[in-house]
């Protein structure tokens, strides 16, 4: 590692980090910029997936941050696997375009091109038809999923992990996904990586408090905005 050089200047990476994946599902939470996506890119590169998404067969232009961190990571395995997938919501279009250009047989993905589906439909088709045993790294999958489809994803997650045939590491802001039973939740805030309880996350607490009393939040947000407006008394 080169201290002070990006991405090793990210607080959670500055002094090195070590963690274990002891359960089938591990969630990473933290504010934007805390290092979640960079850590996932590094994991993906270390496993052999493209740092922009896909599996070992889908190598696109590498992301510098993920490449640098991936070279520094040292992974220990109980049973090493190269099967799996790295899903990034923001670059999923690149993966779908790659399949189109390669003339892929979409029977492996539910029978229809991803380009003929909505973003959320394409995600679920990938989850249902291509996720089996292996190591899966997902970066904010909720970005393309409505609340109802997030529930559908949780069902797929249960089907894959109940027999312990798959391992998932998922970065998310979704309190719905974070509620998955038996998952480990790791926070990357405050410059360290530590396990937290689902109900202790700001994602859960803020969503719960807002839904219970939205008017209180509107008063706080809008009164400040009105006070800053030109001509406000």
Go through the PLM ranges and name each one.
Residues 33-34:
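ATP-binding Walker
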Residues 1-17:
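N-terminal pre-Walker A segment at the start of P-loop NTPase domains
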Residues 13-23, 129-131, 162:
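Phosphate-binding P-loop
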Residues 30:
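The Walker A (P-loop) glycine that initiates the GxxxxGKT/S ATP-binding motif of P-loop NTPases
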Residues 23-27, 37-101:
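ABC ATPase nucleotide-binding domain signature region
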Residues 148, 152-233:
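C-terminal lobe/lid and adjacent interdomain/linker elements of RecA-like ASCE P-loop ATPase modules
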Residues 113-140, 148-163:
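GG-anchored amphipathic helix commonly corresponding to the ABC/SMC/Rad50 NBD signature/C-loop
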